[in-house]
Swiss-Prot record:
Pfam families the UniProt entry points to: TatA_B_E
Classification via Gene3D superfamilies: 1.20.5.3310
Keyword annotations of the record: Cell inner membrane, Cell membrane, Membrane, Protein transport, Translocation, Transmembrane, Transmembrane helix, Transport
Protein name: Sec-independent protein translocase protein TatA
Subunit structure: The Tat system comprises two distinct complexes: a TatABC complex, containing multiple copies of TatA, TatB and TatC subunits, and a separate TatA complex, containing only TatA subunits. Substrates initially bind to the TatABC complex, which probably triggers association of the separate TatA complex to form the active translocon.
Cross-referenced PANTHER family: SEC-INDEPENDENT PROTEIN TRANSLOCASE PROTEIN TATA
InterPro entries in alphabetical order: TatA/B/E (IPR003369), TatA/E (IPR006312)
Task of the protein: Part of the twin-arginine translocation (Tat) system that transports large folded proteins containing a characteristic twin-arginine motif in their signal peptide across membranes. TatA could form the protein-conducting channel of the Tat system.
GO molecular function, one term: protein transmembrane transporter activity
Main location: membrane
An individual GO BP term: protein transport by the Tat complex
Length: 82
């Protein structure tokens, strides 16, 4: 009905094998397999990096906490000057 039947796919596969040969197709298949394997490896290595700290020297602080510390330091400086 408009779709491709199994026989049509089989004929296309035979034509491709005749055009390129089994050796070339085997090489393409192994290249494709290694590319997929490398992609999966890169994805699996990237996931633990999300849990790790981004920078060892950087500790994120809230702006409110930083402002409170600044106000406390100013109060201590005022007391020392007085």
């Amino acid at each position: 009905m408009g779709g491709i039947s199994i026989w049509q796919l089989l004929i296309i596969a035979v034509i491709i094998v005749l055009l390129f040969g089994t050796k070339k197709l085997r090489g393409v298949g192994s290249d494709l397999g290694s590319a997929v394997k490398g992609f999966k490896k890169a994805i699996s290595e990237d996931e633990p990096a999300k849990d790790a700290k981004k920078d060892a020297d950087f500790v994120p602080q809230n702006l409110e906490k930083k402002e409170a510390e600044t106000v406390e330091k100013q109060k201590q400086n005022d007391k020392e000057q007085a």
